[in-house]
Regions:
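Short, well-ordered beta-strand segments in beta-rich or mixed alpha/beta enzyme
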Residues: 2-8, 35-66
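Non-catalytic surface loops within mature trypsin-like serine protease
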Residues: 10-12, 54-56, 90-93
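Intrinsically disordered, low-complexity acidic/polar segments
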Residues: 15-17, 47, 59-61, 95-98
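Short, surface-exposed ligand-recognition loops at beta-strand->loop->(often short) alpha-helix junctions
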Residues: 7-18
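Glycine-rich beta-strand-turn "strand-cap" elements at beta-sheet edges
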Residues: 2, 35-46, 74-98
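Short amphipathic alpha-helical segment that frequently serves as the phosphate-/nucleotide-binding helix
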Residues: 19-23
Length: 98
């Protein structure tokens, strides 16, 4: 599996819009997408971390380089103070409870 972790800084008051925008990714049924998680930090509610999981590196980059993803990304940027800080990489361990 492959994915990214991104640090994002949301504009004030856009929490609900950010959650709705992330739901649009789920509704898009992106080929190879496994899961997405958004964390809102306790000590700074405007700071969010996004974790995205794909089946493999090829699926991740096929999505990242698609015009559809570019359009989704541009909509997401409207809710952020600036571009996310991306950290792409191979997922080397997974544990699921239950």
């Amino acid at each position: 599996m492959y994915g990214t972790v991104a640090r994002m800084r949301a504009k004030p008051g856009v929490g609900a819009q950010l959650a709705e925008e992330m739901r649009s990714y789920e509704e898009a049924h992106i080929e190879g997408a496994v899961a997405s998680y958004v964390y809102q930090m306790d000590n700074d509610p405007s700071e969010c971390w996004l974790a995205v999981v794909f089946t493999n590196k090829e699926a991740y980059f096929a999505n990242a380089n698609s015009p559809e993803q570019d359009a989704r990304y541009r909509k997401l940027l409207e809710l952020l103070e600036g571009p996310p800080e991306w950290h792409d990489g191979e997922i080397v361990y997974v544990a699921q409870q239950g």
